[in-house]
Amino acid sequence: MQIKTITLKLSAVSLGALFFSGCLGTSFFSSLDNAQVYYPSNDFKSSPSSSGTKGTMKPYTINGKTYYPTVVAVGETADGIASWYGPGFHGKKTSNGETYNQNALTAAHKTLPMNTILKVTNLNNNRQVTVRVNDRGPFVNNRIIDLSKGAASQIDMIASGTAPVRLEVIGFGSSNSGNNIVHSNVNYGNSGEIANNGQIYEGGNFMVQIGAFKNPAGAQTIAARYKTYRTYSSTIRTSSVDGLNRVFLTGFRSEDEARDFAASGAFAGAFVVRE
């Protein structure tokens, strides 16, 4: 699909959000004076994606406005107004083909790559939730993100309908050959939500998660197997939040190197985080 005005068939969830009263808001994009084309703004220091062959990264047009999915880096932030969507869309298909679960910790965003993992902070009360982008929207002005009902509940914005939030990119999920999210990357629940607020590790250097185990012996076995893998080494981190023993490869010289490795397919669903 060429980068021009293109109409992409979106889900009933996304299109339905056009008529949802809670989905009015500010986008991260500014329009050209004489064109209905929206490009990334400086809120996220993003750039147009080169992944044009990936269906969820193709430009698409809604109500005469063209949106270009973008590439962002771990640690980038943006502030804006969040809304939420729920009962009217529960059980319908999202833009990436999943079945929408209003109770899962997911979100709709106009241009972030599918399966981007975001930490969302309600600036009114400092409550936080971690969500995974699995849908497109909201497609009206003055909204930065549409949260699921479950995510909105976590940061206490159900009653208000909207709230000022800060979004931070904390990682990137991936899918296996069946286009299913690989649950070992983040602590996902049975219905695709991120369980236990998706606790991951943050810091300065980048590493790649290759497994997560309830049983410490499982983590130790994998860590020993890949103690030295190519130029990388393994390490285990145990979360005090969910009790999972996560196995990481370390030694990446840059975020780009870590992301290239995660995308190489060496480990199904490899997931980039900051050490």
Swiss-Prot record:
It comes from the Bacteria. Its main location: membrane. Keywords: Cell membrane, Cell wall biogenesis/degradation, Lipoprotein, Lyase, Membrane, Palmitate, Signal. Residues 200-275 form the SPOR domain. A lipid is attached at C23 (S-diacylglycerol cysteine). Pfam families: DPBB_1 (PF03330), SPOR (PF05036). One of its GO terms (cellular component) is plasma membrane. GO terms for molecular function: lytic endotransglycosylase activity; peptidoglycan binding. A lipid is attached at C23 (N-palmitoyl cysteine). Residues 1-22 form the signal peptide. One of its GO terms (biological process) is peptidoglycan metabolic process. InterPro entries: RlpA, RlpA-like_DPBB, RlpA-like_sf, RplA, SPOR-like_dom, SPOR-like_sf. It is a lipid-anchor. Its EC number is 4.2.2.-. It is an enzyme of class 4 (lyase). It is found in: Cell membrane. Belongs to the RlpA family. Lytic transglycosylase with a strong preference for naked glycan strands that lack stem peptides. PANTHER family: ENDOLYTIC PEPTIDOGLYCAN TRANSGLYCOSYLASE RLPA (PTHR34183:SF1). This is Endolytic peptidoglycan transglycosylase RlpA. It comes from Campylobacter jejuni subsp. jejuni serotype O:2 (strain ATCC 700819 / NCTC 11168).
